[in-house]
Design a protein with these regions (language model features):
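Conserved catalytic-loop position in the HRD/HxD motif
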Residues: 91
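Early-domain small/polar-rich strand-loop-helix modules and first-structured segments
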Residues: 1
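Active-site-adjacent helix-turn-beta-strand microarchitecture at beta-sheet edges
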Residues: 95-97
């Protein structure tokens, strides 16, 4: 449900999911919850009306957070479970990517760029396989967005990815390489292993 409008079908799926979470919170006697909406809702013209529907249907008040807040939450979720002190952290979502530069386990810089897995798919729609020229065009587009970030390191440092897209890529890599476990947390792939 990306683009100018958060589509009704996508809204309904999200509301159904949130109803399940609301039920689980009630069953487990959770007294305080925090539900946030990220880039897909943030950029949709009907994002605030969707939040009203969520509140009405699932009795969950939601807040739209900024890209900086989204990056900060991702950092908070990672920093205490990763044994690396300097790295780039990225969260590739459906509508955006959040990138943070971490040094000495501190988030020095962060940015949210409106390029996500779903938004890129919609922007560069193709029927069937992508041609080499189209792939080159997509890479050029992404590279231009990344080059606008002045604090990105010029020399290689570890990159840590979080979110659904990264989980799926890790699962594909595990299957492809014959990895014997299904554990994803702290799963490592070399840059050569990606290609």
């Amino acid at each position: 449900g990306l683009g100018d409008v958060y589509k009704r079908q996508a809204q309904n799926r999200a509301i159904d999911c949130l109803k399940v979470y609301a039920h689980l919170a009630k069953v487990h006697q959770v007294t305080k919850t925090l539900a946030v909406a990220t880039a897909a809702v943030r950029t949709a013209r009907n994002g605030s009306s969707f939040l009203k529907r969520v509140h009405s249907a699932a009795n969950i008040p939601m807040t739209i957070i900024s890209g900086k807040q989204e990056a900060a939450l991702g950092f908070s979720g990672v920093i205490h479970t990763i044994d690396t002190s300097e790295f780039l952290l990225f969260d590739l979502g459906g509508a955006s990517i959040e990138i943070s530069l971490v040094k000495n386990k501190k988030q020095l810089h962060s940015v949210s760029i409106p390029i996500g897995a779903v938004s890129l798919t919609e922007k560069f729609k193709s029927s069937g396989l992508l041609s080499a020229a189209k792939i080159k065009h997509i890479r050029s587009y992404i590279k231009s967005k990344l080059q606008s970030i002045p604090w990105l390191p010029k020399s290689p440092i570890p990159v840590i990815g979080i979110g659904g897209t990264i989980r799926n890529l890790a699962k594909i890599h595990q299957r492809y390489s014959g990895y014997p476990l299904s554990k994803l947390h702290n799963y490592k792939v070399s840059s050569q292993g990606l290609f």
